[in-house]
Amino acid sequence: MSKIIIATANKGKAKEFEKIFAKFNIEVATLADFPEIGEIEETGTTFAENAALKAETVASVLNQTVIADDSGLIVDALDGAPGVYSARYAGIAHDDAKNNEKLLKNLEGVEPDKRTARFHCTLAVATPSEKTSFYTGEVEGVIAEQLCGTNGFGYDPLFFLPEFGLTMAEIPAEKKNEISHRANAIKQLEKDLAEVVEKVTKK
């Protein structure tokens, strides 16, 4: 089985990548498998900058092809916030409860038809001495007025999908892995996936 490295320490993201890549018979390794690398500070101002920073840093250290993603929630009524700061929106990295609480507070009084939003994902594929490639995916939704569902992570309990009548945290994981922003970005990557896997297996 081929193995590919995903430059993330986020367990929720890692689990999604594992399930999505499993259908291609590709095993996933993450930064949890390489503790010596440590945390990579996301200093970019765009999803692409942060994804490239993570992928290129890890590719350089391990001397092989690496995929990284940077993703987040874009809320129209908040001028695109939380955006690249989604994970640390409330000031503490990866505190889902605090982030959701702040999002609801900032949207108090906003009418349902004005609560449109989208999850965005940019994938960066970095290979030492080669130009980094980018793939993007999005999924459209509306921010609910209260938390619903226990599946998923992050803003999933607030991200309402009108076509399903459910939040992202209420739909089965299998369905989420078909329609999510991350899944849509990987669909864009699919056309080049054989080439990426070939680079990995050469190492």
Curated annotation (Swiss-Prot):
Cofactor annotation: Mg(2+)
Residues reported in the UniProt entry to bind Mg(2+): E41, D70
Record EC number: 3.6.1.66
Gene Ontology terms: cellular component: cytosol
Molecular function as annotated in GO: dITP diphosphatase activity; ITP diphosphatase activity; metal ion binding; nucleotide binding; ribonucleoside triphosphate phosphatase activity; XTP diphosphatase activity
Reactions catalysed according to its record: XTP + H2O = XMP + diphosphate + H(+); dITP + H2O = dIMP + diphosphate + H(+); ITP + H2O = IMP + diphosphate + H(+)
Keyword field: Hydrolase, Magnesium, Metal-binding, Nucleotide metabolism, Nucleotide-binding
Catalytic machinery residues: D70 (proton acceptor)
Root EC class: hydrolase
Residue positions binding substrate: T8, A9, N10, K11, G12, K13, S71, F153, G154, Y155, D156, K176, H181, R182
InterPro entries xrefs: dITP/XTP_pyrophosphatase (IPR020922), ITPase-like_fam (IPR029001), RdgB/HAM1 (IPR002637)
Domain of life the protein comes from: Bacteria
One record GO biological process: purine nucleoside triphosphate catabolic process
Note on cofactor: Binds 1 Mg(2+) ion per subunit.
Biological role: Pyrophosphatase that catalyzes the hydrolysis of nucleoside triphosphates to their monophosphate derivatives, with a high preference for the non-canonical purine nucleotides XTP (xanthosine triphosphate), dITP (deoxyinosine triphosphate) and ITP. Seems to function as a house-cleaning enzyme that removes non-canonical purine nucleotides from the nucleotide pool, thus preventing their incorporation into DNA/RNA and avoiding chromosomal lesions.
Family matches, as NCBIfam families: PRK14822.1, RdgB/HAM1 family non-canonical purine NTP pyrophosphatase
Quaternary state and interactors: Homodimer.
Family of the protein in this entry: Belongs to the HAM1 NTPase family.
Protein name: dITP/XTP pyrophosphatase
